C-alpha cells in the first residue's frame, strides 16, 4: 500500500520535463518501480514493447503527476488522454492503459489535484476549474512537445465532466 508520504517522495523524485523518452537511462526510483509493480503498470511484452516515463506538470498551484506510456512509433495510431474519476488515481487504470497500448495508442494519464500522487488536499477542490486547469496544462505541454496525434480523450465520472 502507498501512503501520502510515499506519494510525496515519488512526486519529489520526478522530473519536470518527462515527455522526452530519448534518454536510455533508467531513471525510475525504487519507490516508483514499487508503485508501478503494485498497481500492475509495469507492462512488459504484453503491450508490444511500450516505454514509460513519469514526471511533473506544474500549474503553479499544484504539482500534477503525469504518466506517459508510449508504443513503438511504427505501431502508433495516436494518443489517448485518460482522465480518472473522483477518489480514483492512475493506479486503478492499468486495464484501460494496457488496452489502449495494445490497440496502438500512446497513453497520457495524470492524477487530478488531491488524488493519487499529485499534490493538494485529498479529494478536495475549490472549483472544477482547478481540475480542468490541470488538464489544460498537460495538453499544452503535450502539444509543445509534439506528442503523437490524433488525440482522443477518455474520461470516467469526474474525468468525463472535465
Question: Which positions does each model-derived feature cover?
Answer:
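An N-terminal hydrophobic leader/cap segment in hydrolases
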Residues: 1-58, 64-72
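Short beta-strand element of the alpha/beta-hydrolase
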Residues: 76-85
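Alpha/beta-hydrolase fold nucleophile elbow
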Residues: 146-157
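Short coil/turn segments at beta-strand junctions that form active-site/ligand-binding loops
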Residues: 77-78, 104-105, 148-150
Amino acid at each position: 500500500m502507498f501512503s501520502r508520504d510515499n506519494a510525496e517522495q515519488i512526486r519529489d523524485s520526478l522530473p519536470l520535463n518527462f515527455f522526452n523518452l530519448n534518454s536510455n537511462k533508467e531513471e525510475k526510483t525504487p519507490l516508483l518501480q514499487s508503485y508501478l509493480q503494485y498497481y500492475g503498470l509495469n507492462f512488459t511484452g504484453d503491450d508490444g514493447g511500450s516505454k514509460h516515463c513519469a514526471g511533473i506538470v506544474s500549474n503553479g498551484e499544484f504539482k500534477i503527476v503525469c504518466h506517459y506510456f508510449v508504443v513503438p512509433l511504427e505501431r502508433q495510431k495516436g494518443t489517448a488522454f485518460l482522465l480518472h474519476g473522483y477518489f480514483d488515481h492512475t493506479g486503478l487504470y492499468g486495464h484501460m492503459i494496457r488496452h489502449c497500448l495494445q490497440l496502438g495508442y500512446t497513453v497520457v494519464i495524470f492524477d487530478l489535484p488531491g488524488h493519487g500522487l499529485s499534490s493538494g488536499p485529498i479529494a478536495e477542490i475549490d472549483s472544477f476549474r482547478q481540475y480542468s486547469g490541470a488538464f489544460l496544462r498537460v495538453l499544452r505541454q503535450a502539444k509543445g512537445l509534439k506528442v503523437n496525434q490524433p488525440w482522443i480523450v477518455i474520461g470516467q465520472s469526474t474525468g468525463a465532466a472535465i
